[in-house]
Design a protein with these regions (language model features):
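Subtilisin-like serine protease catalytic core
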Residues: 1-14, 22-67, 108, 132-136, ...
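Subtilisin-like peptidase catalytic core
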Residues: 16-94, 140-145, 180-191, 195, ...
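Hydrolase catalytic cores
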Residues: 36-39, 55-61, 126-129, 210-212, ...
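C-terminal subdomain of the subtilisin-like protease fold in secreted/lumenal serine endopeptidases
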Residues: 85-87, 138, 258-274, 348-425, ...
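Short, solvent-exposed loop/turn segments enriched in Ser/Thr/Gly
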Residues: 411-418, 459-469, 499
């Protein structure tokens, strides 16, 4: 943190500077101070947990990159210092086993580890280590309840499009329902022979040639001068963009007259084709605080567990800055400390809670969130939902595990799993259990003592990944357990004899080859083998624990993926053979932010375009 910031200095206890190798980890970049303020500010701004003690560990000299060995040293030092919470975010779209092992070691020592998901969204599979660690609490970012939480919708006929309001666009009192018409590039001469009065204009970004610059503000001016009610600008290159109407090249007296939004090139071309037969459209711009930030990194990270775990406010967050100033900033970096502060309050109430119990409470008490069309966000984007601190604080039930993944097929149409429930020593009287989700899967349940047994059954043999939730009511509090159901066309059977696994492929019947990867879920050590209809291999597992089984089955030109988990109950009688390995040199990691509660921060910059 910034030792000159009066809102924070009283909260700093100790730490270490791994860059200069001294005991004064002064923040020179500003992000550590911003993150610390969200957790523990105690002045003009009040943090989530203003009375916590802050440990700070500096690992970056320039705020741009950090050697992974310093990250590991900082985590290990935090373990030595016996902190309660470590909050880290690393912007690496990769798995880093040594960092993950350091995180696991911290959790084994009873420390809760919170990881920001990263700022590489909205693309899928953009969460890296340590946020992809299954044991960490991974946090994505939502808007907040400020006026800046603006979203937009565009529906043409029955088709809903993803559109983003441009900077400078204002909320409208009522949706605009009218015809939509293609207006080329929305330049002045594009409206010479085009009547757009009372209509929404669809226009392409830029101009007819690559070097022609047409500001978004000019597109808005010409569309509104010709009587348009709204403007939709689609990209002239793949993907989405964040446009701004207010910029340095616009006149001081300019004020946008009509709502203006952006969309991807792909959807823009699709809409342009739709306009050949359907022109009835509705455009709306409104506040939606629980909308997931576009930059928030997404899963999936693994077929065996789901990330992120939950989301928290991370857009336009007002917090402390260097030299006793304040700053509004955005990033999953600033969503994570909201969760860290909440955890501090939970531990203050009940210091005996374990990291896994804390994680369960936060997941199962999260609020389900929806997009601008009132559709639930996918788990890969929003996890279980937005943190609900009040509900978490009043929670009286812990679920283990707090999420379920079922693997079904046309041959294995049902599966039963168990959730252990803990009511802090009280007897458990479940009032109600309900399920939401897909029509092709049905659920049933049974409560026995402190166990909740959930059975999923395939109704329609449709391959894919389907999302559901179980809603469990206890003592008038309704908890939720996210459920993923994966349906495949293939089936394997796992056989065990004295810690040795063998595999049989049941479907497809005419399979030719199967590659099987077995991963220790704690150490991430992988072993592989291959089998054919005439060649069988087995695999010895020496350590007790849960193993992830991934099977890739080839049949002619098709490939089928099958996933399962298997629990080895005891260690093998014989010792595991020692295999030598060559250590590879560590390379510096590019970081979007790393914050601890313990705090080191490097931020992310998010640029808008004005043409």
């Amino acid at each position: 943190p910034d030792f000159f910031n009066s809102d924070q200095i009283s909260r700093f206890l100790k730490g270490y500077d791994f860059v200069d190798n001294d005991s004064i980890p002064q923040d020179t970049n500003g992000h550590g101070t911003q993150v610390t303020g969200i957790i523990a500010a105690d002045g003009q701004l009040i943090g989530i947990a203003p009375k916590v003690e802050i440990f700070s560990y500096r690992v970056s000299s320039d705020g741009e990159s950090v050697p992974s060995d310093l990250i590991i040293k900082a985590i290990n030092r935090a373990v030595e210092d016996r902190v309660d919470i470590i909050n880290i975010s690393l912007g690496v779209n990769m798995t880093h086993a040594k960092i993950d092992n350091a995180v696991n070691n911290a959790i084994d020592h009873g420390i809760v580890v919170v990881a920001a998901a990263g700022n590489s969204g909205p693309d899928k599979s953009t969460i890296g280590s340590p946020a992809r660690n299954p044991n960490a609490i991974t946090v994505g970012a939502t808007y907040n309840n400020r006026d800046s939480s603006m979203v937009s919708t565009l529906q043409v006929g029955e088709t809903q499009f993803q559109v983003l309001p441009m900077l400078g666009t204002n909320i409208i009192s009522d949706p605009i329902s009218t015809d939509i018409i293609f207006g080329k590039y929305s330049r002045e001469n594009d409206f010479d022979d085009l009547d757009v009065r009372g209509k929404i204009v669809l226009a392409e970004r830029g101009g007819e040639t690559p070097d022609e610059i047409v500001f978004f503000s000019d597109k808005e001016i010409f569309a509104s001068k010709n009587g348009a009610k709204g403007l939709v600008v689609y990209n002239n290159q793949p993907g989405i963009f964040f446009g701004e109407l207010i910029h340095e090249y616009v006149s001081e007296d300019y004020y946008p007259s009509i709502p203006t939004v952006s969309m991807t090139r792909e959807e823009g071309l699709e809409l342009k084709k739709i306009l050949e037969s359907e022109t009835s459209a509705t455009l709306n711009v409104f506040n939606h605080p629980d909308f997931i930030a576009t930059f928030s990194a997404r899963g999936p990270v693994s077929p065996f567990y789901q990330k992120p775990d939950l989301v928290a406010p991370g857009v336009f967050v007002n917090t402390t800055s260097l030299k006793n100033f304040y700053n509004i900033t955005s990033g999953t970096s600033y969503a994570a400390p909201h969760v860290s502060g909440a955890i501090a309050l939970l531990l203050e109430k009940n210091p005996e809670l374990t990291p896994h119990e804390i994680k369960s409470i936060l997941i199962t008490t999260s609020d389900v969130i929806t997009d601008q069309y009132k559709k639930e966000f996918e788990f890969d984007a929003g996890g279980a939902g937005r943190i609900d601190l009040k509900k978490a604080f009043n929670s009286e039930l812990i679920f283990d595990p707090p999420k379920l993944i079922f693997n079904l097929s046309g041959q294995e149409i049902s599966e039963r799993q168990v959730i252990k429930m803990n009511a802090f020593g009280d007897s458990i009287n479940i009032q109600k259990v309900e399920f939401s989700g897909e029509d092709n899967v049905e659920f049933d349940y049974e409560v026995k003592d402190s166990s909740l047994y959930i059975t999923s059954k395939l109704i329609e043999n449709k391959s894919g990944v389907f999302e559901s939730r179980a809603f469990i009511t206890y003592n008038d509090i309704t908890y939720q357990v996210p459920i993923i159901v994966r349906v495949t066309e293939a089936t394997i059977v796992i056989l065990e004899k004295e810690n040795e696994l063998s595999f049989q492929v049941k479907r497809p019947i005419d399979w030719e080859y199967a590659k099987i990867t077995v991963t220790n879920s704690e150490t991430y050590e992988e072993q592989t083998l291959s089998i054919t209809p005439t060649k069988f291999e087995s695999l010895k597992l020496y350590e007790a624990g849960r193993y992830w089984i991934e099977t890739n089955i080839k049949n002619n030109e098709e490939t089928f993926d099958v996933y399962d988990v298997y629990d080895i109950k005891t260690d093998a009688k014989e010792k595991k053979p020692i295999v030598s390995s060559t250590e590879l040199p560590e390379r510096a990691l590019i970081i979007l932010i790393i914050i601890f509660s313990i705090v080191i921060v490097v931020g992310f910059k998010f640029r808008r375009k004005n043409y």
